[in-house]
Amino acid sequence: MHEAQIRVAIAGAGGRMGRQLIQAAMAMEGVQLGAALEREGSSLLGSDAGELAGGGKSGVIVQSSLEAVKDDFDVFIDFTRPEGTLTHLAFCRQHGKGMVIGTTGFDDAGKQAIREASQEIAIVFAANFSVGVNVMLKLLEKAAKVMGDYSDIEIIEAHHRHKVDAPSGTALAMGEAIAGALDKNLKDCAVYSREGYTGERVPGTIGFATVRAGDIVGEHTAMFADIGERVEITHKASSRMTFANGALRSALWLKTKKNGLFDMRDVLGLDVL
């Protein structure tokens, strides 16, 4: 293997995101697809991962056992469900493997487990691996510092009918970016639902609205509304490949890291802007 390459393992190889990750890994210079995983009992076990993803034969066979492929990868990429990701996290921590985590929907205990593991292994944990979304998060911080104290802030997100968590991890990251810029804790100012007689809008809150329909890949808007004007900052994704490429870019970035918890803004160097 070339010294500059990083070998990656992909969790949930047969899922929508898993297949995109496999395609991206096969196409990206400096990355080698080392392993592809599916759950025990899946009909996809034994398949060629590249053929499964529509990218041609890869020579990597889809397996269910991390133990069986532990010597075949350096970084584990996981966009599955919280319970599965935490199982994979424990394995990677035990065996000194880096992780790129795009799974959303973790509770506080799950997030704490990731923080603790990052003391021993290097982890990029982000709600969204799109370059555009992470640029948007930086713009939201700037906008919040200028307009946040004088405007009503609402976050609207839309995803496909199969998404199981709400609000999306990206929407929550947007809220956290805005709240942090205003020296607030999102838990103290977020409003996640409105129904019936709600009374007037409470000043200083950040509202969330969620849409689930069709095959929407992902759309997010933050609205700063004042009397007579409003500013809207929007990101729309048309392909999951943007997330896959960002995840692979993160895996390459991790090759020089021994431990620590990072996000996509670290990978892109946005915090210096």
UniProtKB/Swiss-Prot annotation:
Reactions the enzyme catalyzes: (S)-2,3,4,5-tetrahydrodipicolinate + NAD(+) + H2O = (2S,4S)-4-hydroxy-2,3,4,5-tetrahydrodipicolinate + NADH + H(+); (S)-2,3,4,5-tetrahydrodipicolinate + NADP(+) + H2O = (2S,4S)-4-hydroxy-2,3,4,5-tetrahydrodipicolinate + NADPH + H(+)
Organism: Salmonella enteritidis PT4 (strain P125109)
SUPFAM superfamilies for this protein: Glyceraldehyde-3-phosphate dehydrogenase-like, C-terminal domain, NAD(P)-binding Rossmann-fold domains
Enzyme class, broadest EC rank: oxidoreductase
Source domain of life: Bacteria
Pfam families: DapB_C, DapB_N
Pathway membership, UniProt: Amino-acid biosynthesis; L-lysine biosynthesis via DAP pathway; (S)-tetrahydrodipicolinate from L-aspartate: step 4/4
Keyword Amino-acid biosynthesis part of the UniProt annotation: yes
Underlying gene: dapB
Name of the featured protein: 4-hydroxy-tetrahydrodipicolinate reductase
Gene Ontology MF terms: 4-hydroxy-tetrahydrodipicolinate reductase; NAD binding; NADP binding; oxidoreductase activity, acting on CH or CH2 groups, NAD or NADP as acceptor
Family: Belongs to the DapB family.
Gene3D superfamilies assigned to the protein according to its UniProt record, in alphabetical order: Dihydrodipicolinate Reductase, domain 2, NAD(P)-binding Rossmann-like Domain
GO cellular component entries: cytosol
Stored NCBIfam families: dapB
Compartments, record wording: Cytoplasm
One GO term (biological process): lysine biosynthetic process via diaminopimelate
Active site residues of this protein: 159, 163
Subunit structure: Homotetramer.
Chief place of localization: cytoplasm
Residue numbers binding NAD(+): 12-17, 38, 102-104, 126-129
Positions bound to NADP(+): 39
EC number: 1.17.1.8
UniProt keyword Amino-acid biosynthesis present: yes
